[in-house]
């Protein structure tokens, strides 16, 4: 609940508690407890072998130096499903500059799974594995909407090929990470090789 509404609610109950006081409590709690916690989560994340990365626009009202209509970004970093620890960090930044993931991922030496945004391409020591879901969406968006039958199109063929990979992932969802790797090598790798040779 927004602080101005909490202030009204407390006043209705007979207590004078200003939103400034509550905002100060939040700031102190963040500095004392949440920032160290997020820093520890970041340390743990940097030890992972794979990290999902994605950035999404958000609109922030009354942000200093920016128009109300301008976009800011929430950069989301997440450990993979098979990780021993589930770590997700939301990193707010006022822009979409490549320096944002470079700073966040500094010292990481594993693989990042991304949507293909160029900002992830220049991070030292990192392997970039692009996300199949994002790739599928690009091909799906390229399907002609005015055609009665798009089955012979390049985009549809790509969507179908990626769907076969997704079907395998659905089948192995509950397997251990080691078993998933084995099945992926046996079943998914030939499909991926076919996709890139096609």
Where are these regions (language model features)?
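Catalytic center-proximal scaffold of phosphoryl-transfer enzymes
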Residues: 1-198
């Amino acid at each position: 609940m927004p602080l101005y509404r909490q202030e009204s609610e407390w006043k209705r109950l007979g207590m004078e508690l200003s939103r400034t006081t509550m905002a100060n409590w939040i700031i102190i709690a963040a500095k004392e407890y949440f920032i160290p916690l997020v820093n520890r989560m970041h340390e743990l994340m940097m030890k992972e072998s794979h990290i999902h990365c994605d950035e999404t626009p958000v609109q922030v009202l009354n942000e200093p130096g920016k128009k109300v209509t301008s976009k800011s970004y929430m950069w989301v970093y997440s450990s993979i499903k098979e990780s021993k620890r589930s770590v997700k960090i939301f990193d707010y930044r006022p822009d979409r500059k490549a320096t944002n993931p470079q700073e966040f991922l500094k010292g990481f030496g594993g693989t990042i799974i991304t949507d293909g945004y160029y900002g992830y391409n220049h991070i030292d020591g990192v392997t970039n594995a692009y996300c199949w879901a994002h790739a599928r969406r690009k091909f799906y968006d390229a399907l002609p909407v005015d055609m009665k039958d798009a089955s012979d199109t390049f985009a549809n063929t790509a969507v179908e090929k990626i769907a076969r990979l997704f079907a395998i992932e659905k089948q192995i969802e509950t397997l251990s990470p080691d078993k998933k790797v084995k099945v992926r090598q046996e079943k998914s790798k030939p499909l991926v090789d076919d996709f890139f040779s096609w």
